[in-house]
């Protein structure tokens, strides 16, 4: 399972010295208890670290500077226990460069009706202080997440946990490096994009390598290593010979084992976390990487087909954001292939020639070797399966020429009515929200690609928050989408995102 760095989030409480030492001691005590409770909840994927109460301009600026410089800090959570004059926060906020969450909570859950007095009112002013602080953040046009509710509420804790995963995605984005083993498929538009702008906006480094350079790494893998991995395949997966000679079949599988090991070693040596290939540029490779790529995705690598580096980076990003999640259902590249248009049963059959991540599989996973008309190579081995049912999101990051746009569609995955015995690929089948017809029309109007980065384990809100923190446009297609409203939003986006 993919593991990320043990990130922390700093909990910074605002106040001022106007209230005196006794009050400030209670502020510190309360914020300590909140941090301890959040960490003990079992809901948060990362640790919250208490920081001393911030009461002066210089302390605030120093704390935010330290957060910038601490590689383990993925973001700051702020809360105003008392009133904290917001001009004190300007210098700190100006220098801050990481994700920010404004936690609008208070220590007590219920009004102490019988005992409340002005001392209590002065000490517990979150409703007052958080508005002052919120004003200056808005005036400074800073992107931040606001979570409202009592700190003991599991729903509120879940919102913080959700934001943490997005924040880690923002921080980790600048560490994503994509290896292009092949260029973009000839004459295809949507998989193109400005790689320099992607590095400016997202921090992604996208580099090209000759396919035969990585093929040398593949050829250097020893026979003993290949045989050991093939044995692992045969133990883990069903083997569907379908009339093929067992020894001949195994040789095809061994080619993919050699590719997996060679690719992984090359990626590790060069420090890349995502890869793209193209069936039109295979060089000395004996097969189009299929099973090998599926296994690499399962280990956490991003992948994009036909040179689609944006999808490769997004798949890697989403795997990072979901790393370590309990009961995760999976993340993969997918492609819109063909429709079922029977009334009441509408949906899109999602697949690709070979490369669908087995993390989304439901039930048995099998190895098949079938001819592939594209690539002019040996019959490639691949994993075949059907995917889990349930809700997910399909995302498409596109280059609009003057900016990037992230399209996010809520989809509902289901089983197809009948087996498809002649289809030698892994598949998913979903109906986009609000329905196939509106969803497909909206997707096309927004400019969405035929390749998607798909996951069961993130929400549209999380990916929209990521887009907002990255300063790019997000277009949502969900149960509430109306085409007239979507067209208006797209026109407004043209004006705002210049």
Regions from the language model: what does each represent?
Residues 52-66, 156-158:
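Structural motif
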Residues 60-73, 90-92, 260-269:
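Short, well-structured alpha-helical segments in soluble
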Residues 376-498:
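Extended hydrophobic packing segments that form well-structured cores
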Residues 46-47, 104, 109-244:
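Cap/lid and interdomain-hinge subdomains that line or gate substrate/regulatory clefts
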Residues 232, 236-324:
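Long, internal scaffold/assembly segments composed of regular secondary structure
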Residues 300-425:
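C-terminal catalytic subdomain
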Residues 25-41:
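Short catalytic helix/loop segments, enriched in acidic residues and glycine
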Residues 3-26, 175-184:
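Short beta-strand segments enriched in small/hydrophobic residues
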């Amino acid at each position: 399972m993919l593991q990320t760095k043990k990130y922390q989030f700093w909990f910074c409480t605002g106040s001022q010295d106007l209230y005196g030492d006794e009050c400030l001691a209670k502020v510190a005590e309360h914020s300590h208890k909140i941090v301890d409770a959040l960490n003990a909840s079992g809901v948060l994927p990362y640790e919250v670290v208490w920081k001393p109460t911030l009461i002066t301009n210089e302390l605030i600026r120093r704390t935010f500077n330290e957060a910038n410089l601490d590689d383990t800090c993925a973001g700051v959570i702020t809360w105003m226990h008392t009133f904290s004059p917001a001009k004190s926060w300007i210098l700190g906020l100006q220098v801050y460069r990481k994700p920010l969450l404004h936690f609008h909570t208070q220590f007590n859950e219920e009004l102490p009706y019988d005992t409340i007095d002005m001392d209590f009112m002065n000490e517990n002013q979150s409703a007052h202080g958080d508005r002052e602080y919120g004003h200056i953040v808005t005036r400074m046009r800073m992107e931040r997440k606001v979570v409202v509710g009592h700190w003991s509420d599991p729903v509120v804790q879940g919102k913080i946990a959700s934001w943490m995963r997005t924040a880690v995605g923002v921080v980790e984005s600048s560490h994503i490096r994509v290896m292009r083993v092949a260029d973009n498929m000839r004459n295809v538009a949507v998989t193109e994009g400005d790689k320099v702008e992607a590095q400016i906006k997202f921090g992604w480094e996208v580099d090209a390598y000759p396919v035969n350079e990585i093929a040398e790494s593949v050829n250097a893998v020893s026979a003993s290593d290949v045989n050991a991995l093939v044995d692992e395949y045969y133990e883990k997966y069903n083997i569907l010979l379908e009339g093929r000679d067992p020894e001949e079949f195994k040789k095809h599988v061994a080619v993919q084992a050699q590719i997996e090991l060679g690719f992984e070693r090359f990626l590790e040596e060069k420090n890349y976390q995502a890869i793209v290939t193209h069936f039109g540029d295979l060089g000395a490779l004996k097969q189009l990487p299929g099973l090998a790529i599926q296994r690499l995705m399962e280990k956490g690598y991003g992948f994009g087909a036909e040179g689609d580096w944006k999808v490769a980076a997004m798949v890697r990003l989403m795997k990072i954001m979901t790393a370590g999640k309990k009961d995760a259902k999976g993340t993969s590249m997918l492609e819109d292939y063909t429709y079922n248009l029977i009334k009441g049963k509408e949906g899109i059959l999602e697949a690709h020639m070979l490369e669908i991540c087995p993390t989304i599989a439901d039930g048995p996973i099998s190895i098949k070797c079938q001819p592939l008309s594209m690539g002019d190579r040996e019959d490639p081995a691949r994993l075949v399966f059907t995917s889990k049912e349930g809700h997910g999101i399909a995302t498409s990051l596109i280059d609009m020429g003057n900016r990037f746009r992230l399209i996010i569609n809520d989809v509902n995955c289901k089983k197809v009515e009948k087996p498809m015995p002649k289809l030698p690929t892994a598949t998913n089948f979903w109906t986009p929200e609000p329905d196939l017809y509106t969803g497909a029309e909206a997707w096309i109007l927004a400019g969405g690609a035929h390749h998607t980065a798909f996951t069961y384990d993130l929400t549209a809100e999380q990916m929209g928050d990521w887009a907002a923190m990255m300063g790019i446009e997000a277009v949502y297609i969900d149960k509430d989408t109306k085409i007239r409203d979507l067209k208006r939003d797209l026109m407004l986006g043209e004006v705002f995102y210049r």
